[in-house]
Amino acid sequence: MPTIASPLPLATTGPENGSSIYDYDYLDDVTVLVCSKDEVLSFGRVFLPVVYSLIFVLGLAGNLLLLVVLLHSVPQRRRMIELYLLNLAVSNLLFVVTMPFWAISVAWHWVFGSFLCKVVSTLYSINFYCGIFFITCMSLDKYLEIVHAQPLHRPKTRFRNLLLIVMVWITALAVSVPEMVFVKVHQTLDGVWHCYADFGGHATIWKLYLRFQMNLLGFLFPLLAMIFFYSRIGCVLVRLRPPGQGRALRMAAALVVVFFLLWFPYNLTLFLHSLLDLHVFGNCKISHRLDYMLQVTESLAFSHCCFTPVLYAFSSHSFRQYLKAVLSVVLRRHQAPGTAHAPPCSHSESSRVTAQEDVVSMNDLGERQADISLNKGEIGNN
């Protein structure tokens, strides 16, 4: 099962990385507390496969739709927000394709061999972090466009943003190194195979490190960045009072609130698990409760790949226009076979329609801010 510190090590497994941390048995040499976790394991074998299957189906459908719209309807020279969404969709797709492996592993055991153990664990970890990082990048992009009125299509600006995308993938790969190094298949005494990270005699230290890494890189730093970026965006919206100001403010608040609601319970549970391992507090009753909490909050956090892309995509007025164009083509093909090859509305038509409507999103406001900045510069030069 996809958990940082070896999910269900005695019955089911998952990556012991910095993204999800199950340690149901607490049987490390340095651990004093030893509790029976049969009830927790039984609950996980029923609850987690169902949740992972739902995440797989919903995440696959939503992100494939997002990917199709971005690849086929968005103009070839995409804005940075659309490139971030494109990378987010790819990352989420790679993440959700690992869910069936973990669902089978939790319900039964690992049956996919040593090679897929490493591949699936590494894919899980890399794209777990990439999803969070690209969400943060999108808030940075809106901040630069709206607050600093950064021109959208300057070569230097575009190059820096593309470099940021590359750095996101490299950073996610770097924090996933433990998956590549330590994860392997293990056979129990009764001949059952599991896939999880074996840290040897330093298991507790590694688990604490990976949990705190998740707390900082996967939650606290992105949350603080989003709060800062959207607070500044809100100040600009209040000062300029553009059309649709209220909707844009609500959208900015919703993006931060959704991120917090999805990720805070999970990260709090990971932090409490770390305190338990450090013997700050703990007994078997608390240990059991934390194990149940971890299964539920982890599932809530994983659902981000189903809902977040939709929320971000539909905050863009232009994306809604692209989606309408795709759906209209699909409906025409379904209703009238003779018009199956009728072309969708052109990019120029779509752009004109978008430009004629009121600005009601942060994305559109960012474009207007950049245009205003360029016009001021031209006037100053004259």
Swiss-Prot record:
Membrane-spanning regions, if any?
50-70, 93-113, 119-140, 163-183, 218-238, 251-271, 294-314
Q: Name one GO biological process term.
A: immune response
- Stretches in topological domain Cytoplasmic: 71-92, 141-162, 239-250, 315-382
Which InterPro entries does the entry link to? CCR1-9-like, Chemokine_rcpt, CXCR4/ACKR2, GPCR_Rhodpsn, GPCR_Rhodpsn_7TM
Cystine links in this protein are C117-C195
Q: Name one GO cellular component term.
A: external side of plasma membrane
Q: Which residues lie on this side of the membrane: Extracellular?
A: 1-49, 114-118, 184-217, 272-293
Predominantly, its location class is: other
The post-translation modification note in this UniProt entry reads: Phosphorylated on serine residues in the C-terminal cytoplasmic tail.
Which compartment or compartments is the protein found in? Early endosome; Recycling endosome; Cell membrane
Query: Gene3D superfamilies, per this entry?
Result: Rhodopsin 7-helix transmembrane proteins (1.20.1070.10)
Q: State the membrane topology.
A: Multi-pass membrane protein
Question: What are the boundaries of the region C-terminal cytoplasmic tail?
Answer: 327-382
Q: Where is it made, tissue-wise?
A: Predominantly expressed in spleen.
The UniProt keywords, alphabetically, are:
Cell membrane, Disulfide bond, Endosome, G-protein coupled receptor, Glycoprotein, Inflammatory response, Membrane, Phosphoprotein, Receptor, Transducer, Transmembrane, Transmembrane helix
Q: Which CDD domains match?
A: 7tmA_ACKR2_D6
Q: Which residues are glycosylated?
A: N17
Does Signal count among this protein's keywords? no
Molecular functions (GO terms): C-C chemokine binding; C-C chemokine receptor activity; chemokine receptor activity; scavenger receptor activity
Write out the function statement from the record: Atypical chemokine receptor that controls chemokine levels and localization via high-affinity chemokine binding that is uncoupled from classic ligand-driven signal transduction cascades, resulting instead in chemokine sequestration, degradation, or transcytosis. Also known as interceptor (internalizing receptor) or chemokine-scavenging receptor or chemokine decoy receptor. Acts as a receptor for chemokines including CCL2, CCL3, CCL3L1, CCL4, CCL5, CCL7, CCL8, CCL11, CCL13, CCL17, CCL22, CCL23, CCL24, SCYA2/MCP-1, SCY3/MIP-1-alpha, SCYA5/RANTES and SCYA7/MCP-3.
Per the similarity annotation, which family is this? Answer: Belongs to the G-protein coupled receptor 1 family. Atypical chemokine receptor subfamily.
Write the protein's name. Atypical chemokine receptor 2
- The protein's organism comes out as Rattus norvegicus (Rat)
